[in-house]
Amino acid sequence: MTVANSRIPTQTHSGLTEMANAQSKRLTISLLVPCYNEETSLESSIISCLNQTRPFDQLVFVDDASKDRTPEILAKFANRITAVRTPQNTGNKSSAQEYGLTFVTGDILVTTDGDTLLHPRFVEEIEKDFADSEVTAVAGYVNSLPYNWLTLCRAFYYIVGQNLHKVAQNYLNYIFVMPGCASAFRTEIFRTVCTFDHDTITEDLDFTYKLHRNDHKIIYNQNAITYTQDPTTLHGYMHQMRRWYSGGWQNLVKHFSFVVVSHPIRAIELSLIYIEGLAFSSLLLITPFLNLYISLYIMIGYMVVVLIFAAWAAWMGRRPAILLAPIPYLFLIYINAYLFMETFILEIVIRRKTLIWFKPQRVEMSQTLI
């Protein structure tokens, strides 16, 4: 029987040489995960990191002198991961990362958290991006694990922010922030450019600014997906938002003068984010005291916009429950506005820098969620 196009291609010597060279140039990828008292979520996180279509070449987990079962859980995977322990609790995520960085050997460094699950193709996606030698860092896509109304609102926020704002930032070649639980860097550049200054409470934003200051290329990959735990209590939510806003103001002060001189257009873009935040927060908090009717009209108009985006986000994220997010989300924007103004006064007006890290309560995670 004759089969059309049945010729079997033969590999020439030059072809074999090219394949060998390609294999020799294969980038090695390391994972760095700081963890402190993560007994409820750590095992699921480790399993997700191990179950990759393209395995990590090295997995480094830094136990920041935990007092729970974290060391015991890490010991269960001792033959598959590198588990190290700080001499004493640093009380700071970036300090634990800095300690763990000394053990990292890969060409590419991936950072995530002990309360985060990686999509099985996360490493595969990251590897594709770094095939471009000009790419220095990759920002991944963050999903909020479902738990209650707070995480539902956060899921809504993530979908809109990452499918609209971050896509636009990627188009303009100015990613605003690398997510701490879904980022990857060329290791040597991370060591020499990013560094750990420990002078802001949001090190991921500090790293991003430093890369921009040195004209390094950051890209956004929506297919490099992670699933993270967000605060499940209002108390935890407020602490996280206070940290994010405080860290934002700290990094604005730290890097703004340099950005103004070297990248004036980007300085304008950066300023607009904070100016818009101040204007919107002031509008929400002050208008009710000036004219209740105007405040009501503003909220009705805003509610219509939120409903439209919620419908789109529910479809985009394949999460129908997001249709229920607008009502509690409107409650949260007042809390956000208050915290934004509070941190502005503390960090910019009074200049009382906050560097205290608050660790939210964790809940158990399931691999079936991804």
Regions found by a protein language model. Name each.
Residues 109:
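Short aromatic/hydrophobic "clamp" motif used to bind/position activated sugar donors
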Residues 85, 92-96, 106, 120-194, ...:
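Long helical/loop segments within the catalytic core of UDP-sugar-dependent glycosyltransferases
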Residues 1-48:
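N-proximal low-complexity "stem/linker" segments adjacent to membrane-targeting elements
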Residues 27-30, 58, 206:
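Cell-envelope/extracellular polymer assembly enzymes that use nucleotide-activated donors
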